[in-house]
Amino acid sequence: MSEENIKFYQGTDDLSKSNNEETLKLIKQKVFDLSNMKNIHFLLGAGVSSGAIPTMKEFIVEIEEKIKTQQKQQEVFKKLKENNNENLENILGVLYAKRDYQLGINEPDKDTDDLIEIIEQTIFEKINIDLSDTSYQAVIDTYKTFYQKVTYRNKDLSRVNIFTTNNDLFNERVLDNLNINYNNGFGGGLERFFNPARFGYTFSKKIETSIEKYEALDNMIYFYKLHGSINW
């Protein structure tokens, strides 16, 4: 089987080189250059964790395997796939709405409840992995390299905003390991609570003991989990 070519686009321009090694070098240089822009935001998708967390298609296959002996659930799931572009989040949204409707008319639907439970359990099992497992080290190293590049930059540049659609905890584990300060919108101690207003806070440290003089914390990350988290 021939090696798949890596494609790299900037807008509509194909910047890919004749071989993958040269393309990867170009991508690394472009990311390095962009990380030094004054205002920079990153959106991390499923591909970043794909070496450890299944892709959407792999989740679909896993769920289909679990319901292969349940004809009614198979039929419902097939229709949901076709009408929602095989997007599990959209599929769950439809199922949640149906469950609420059935409860609203006092006619609970066990098949709907069971299918929701199977999907939720499959996602939880595959995302809630042991991050200390050495088989995931390559993924952790990728995250480490990324955060070291984007956070240890000129402190006069604006804060870095990281957005992710992933539910896993690779970001948090690496940020903790690298001792990087981050704000994920949560406050509190024993009982954590989400307060989106915290994303507007500036975190500073006192630099003069005799006067009220402060400077912003170095390497501060503002971290947004757009689709929630496995530990919420």
Segments from the language model and where they lie:
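An N-terminal structural lobe/cap that precedes and organizes the functional/catalytic core
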Residues: 21-71
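A short, well-structured juxtamembrane/interface segment
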Residues: 23-29, 137-151
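Extended, H/D-rich, highly charged conserved domains that either
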Residues: 83-113, 153-232
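N- or domain-start disorder-to-order transition segments that initiate the globular core
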Residues: 1-34
